[in-house]
Amino acid sequence: MGIEAAAVGGTSPSGSPEGTITLCTGCVEGRPLRGDVHGSTNLPLPDRGGAQSWPAQRTQEHGAAAIRASRGNAVRGLHRRQFLAVTAALLGAPAVTSAVQAAKQVRIGVLAIPSAPQFAPRTQALRAGLRDLGYIEGKNLIIEFRSAEGQYERLAGLAVELIGEKVDVIVTAGTPAIRAAKQATKTVPIVIAAVGDAVAGGLVASLTTPGGNVTGATYFAPELAAKQLELLKQSVPHTSGVAVVMNPNNPAMGPTLHAVEAAGASLKLDLEQVGVRHRDDFHGAFDMIIRRRSRAVLIVDDPITIYNARALADLALQHRLASAGFIEYAEAGGLIGYGVNLTAMWRRAAYFVDRILRGVNAGEIPMERAMKFDLVINRKTAIAIGVAIDPSTLLRADRVIE
């Protein structure tokens, strides 16, 4: 099931124009009754009301037929010329637009935290979204890709490097990368493909009016993490302790941990934070979890955990631990996955890029909040670790991996 993006204000989630094109059909003697052409717009067109009528011309009986015939011929001739002119203009417009688009070479910068192979599904999704809107690599599009290879400290330099490439827009995701891009430029537009909480992270002023040079989409990670913990408790109801695997280097982790702690207290769970800053920390983290006798693990959303989902899922399976995290985590072998489709969000980022390239200020484009969340249960993993998933949870699942 795909992602549904709900605009906070002003635009349709699909990105399609809500207005309609209305041609002047009541022009007489060169004077339009209600205006010539209304172009497409993202705001509804004004109510045009009913068709405007205009008074009949009174003529004397003498010579009326001849006068009407003469005037009718003149008007019909004028209408024909206007019709041909409008038709020619409409037929020619796509060609002109295409020529302009072809002439302009668009340069998009992509700033990624993980390596290029790990990030490939996201960049492919962005390319597909841009292609749908007429931006094609090798024709009118250049994508400048920069990867920090999982090292947050490299992000600032890579962002500056993209600015040096004279990119028209930067597309990125994750609080550390977004902050690096914001520090590198106050003028080049930045599109957030996905982030846990754009407002709490101090990335935008508000969802309706982001401000500055930033716009994009958010999915509110704190609420997701709390729900993941709840689902984990439902799956292993006798568990009293849960290890929370998180990246302490992520500056946006605070609100998520607060939400998890509140959910843990409500569920009467003892939570223990286990920090992982790099992939090399994974084995040590799980050794610590086993020593402390935790039987369940919550994997908190972070670029380090998202792009190393399989390694984490393998360790949880190896130690027969019930675990929950984001969708990709369950797909990689974790027990439970709940969240948004991040790949779909990267494809949606093309919509924001297109609006910016058409002249709209990034800070004036409302942020979108992901409103569609999927539940994925890995039944194969449940059988392997000896966990019986509650039938009601299976019925609620959007997808069950057998």
Question: Which positions does each model-derived feature cover?
Answer:
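Short hydrophobic alpha-helices and adjacent helix-cap/hinge residues
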Residues: M1-E402
